[in-house]
Design a protein with these regions (language model features):
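N-terminal soluble domains immediately following signal/targeting peptides that reside
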Residues: 37-192
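Sec/Tat signal peptide C-region and signal peptidase I cleavage site
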Residues: 31-36
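Bacterial N-terminal signal peptides
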Residues: 19-30
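Intrinsic, low-complexity polybasic segments
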Residues: 3-6
């Protein structure tokens, strides 16, 4: 009979059957992984990854993007015009890219930026060896009641023409979920 489980007589047979079952499960899992979506933080032009965590008194936004999305190139700047573009990008990232629903009573906190190509923060050895250049950013919001916040608005599409899609992973006390924003959307709705 096709698809029927093999008979496992006796103790020795049970161990062999258990081992065979584990091999089968591992094979199925590896096939599924091969067709899964790219891991968060993977380098894909036009796409920004956001991880958002909502705690009782804090909202954290972790962003990862290829530099090309933000600058139009993926390397250290080579001339004065490119250095000017980098300075403008950094100022924009330190500005108000994310606005939290006033119901959460949040105020913007620290912004941390990291990019090996731009010599910002801690260099990522994997990025240096890959030939691709990314920018990772961390945005913190201190809140009186983060759980009351119903949304976060972002101006990423408005400020950076190279961004075509934003993949978001949310983690709150009400659970986790994924969503995707495309132009002209700017609101990330938080689970309530």
């Amino acid at each position: 009979m096709v698809g029927a489980a093999p008979a496992c007589p006796g103790d020795a047979g049970t161990m062999r059957c258990a081992a065979a079952a584990l091999v089968a499960i591992a094979s199925i899992a590896s096939i599924g992984a091969a067709f899964a979506a790219p891991p968060l933080g993977s380098h894909q032009h036009g796409v920004v990854q956001l991880d958002i965590a909502v705690d009782a008194n804090r909202i954290s936004v972790q962003m990862s993007s290829p530099l090309d999305n933000l600058l139009g190139f993926e390397r250290a700047p080579r001339n004065e015009a490119e250095r000017g573009r980098v300075a403008a990008m950094l100022a924009t990232l330190r500005d108000t890219l994310f606005v939290v629903d006033p119901a959460g009573a949040c105020r913007a906190g620290a912004v941390q930026l990291s990019s090996a190509a731009l010599k910002l923060g801690e260099p990522d050895p994997a990025e240096q060896q890959s030939g691709h250049a990314d920018l990772d950013a961390s945005f913190e919001f201190d809140c009186s009641s983060a759980a009351r916040a119903g949304f976060i608005d972002t101006s990423l599409f408005e400020r950076f023409a190279g961004i075509q899609r934003i993949d978001v992973q949310l983690a709150t006390s009400r659970g986790q979920r994924k969503l995707t924003l495309t132009r002209p959307a700017q609101r990330i709705v938080l689970p309530r």
